[in-house]
Amino acid sequence: MQLIDIHTHIYPDEIAQKATDSIKSFYQLGGGGMDGTEKMLREKGKEAGISRFVILPVAIRPDRVMGINDFIRSRTAGKPEYVGFGTIHAGMEAPAEEAERLLFMGLRGIKMHPDSQRFAIDDLRLLPMYDAIQGKLPVMLHMGDQRYDYSHPVKLRRILDLFPKLQVIAAHFGGYGMYETAYDLLKDKDCIFDVSSSLMFMEDGVAERYIRAYGAERMAFGTDYPLWDPVTETERFFRLRLTDEEFDQIGHKTAERFLEL
């Protein structure tokens, strides 16, 4: 079965381990054995049977956005196994202009992590960008954190009400650790979801229940490398009690349709 990993991150080799450790520290996680390099992603992906990877960057500081986007382009351009996204920060001078530059560079979407970037999904500074990219660039949003409300699902609902043509991937079943709240707020909105960084925290049968409530056609497979080992996450995914059709849909068809791969 073909697999597309819709949720991965890579870093320059010289800072990859430090960046990975920083992410784990942010979530108070330890170990894992992943180093955040492109090389390890490819090795682990091959072992897991993953054929394509969506590469998602995040800029914690506004002044690093352009350099990070240039790095992602340099690592993904001309490589059919990669789908490169750029990143945006609400604190940068002109988010909409950088989004246009991403299009020019051939990057395929925008990734934002509101909790680590410290701005809300519905930050007023982002509204012109959301308007400009409707129907042009999809947005992958980290969703949910019990410590902050930057990425609360209600904020995404507001944005989707304002910009109904905005293409959004709501990561982590729409809200890490707040799955029922996310479902109540987003079940009727036009967005898709990924399963990353969630399956290990759900009790038996919960993932299947939400997958079927949303519909497999709205769910996409993701590992959140280097937070987790793609091999382990792929095995965890295939332990779900789903039909072959549901595995096929989540494993690659949703990503292919949504990202026009």
Regions found by a protein language model. Give the residues of each.
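Mid-to-C-terminal alpha-helical segments outside catalytic/metal-binding sites
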Residues: 1-9, 13-52, 216-220, 231-261
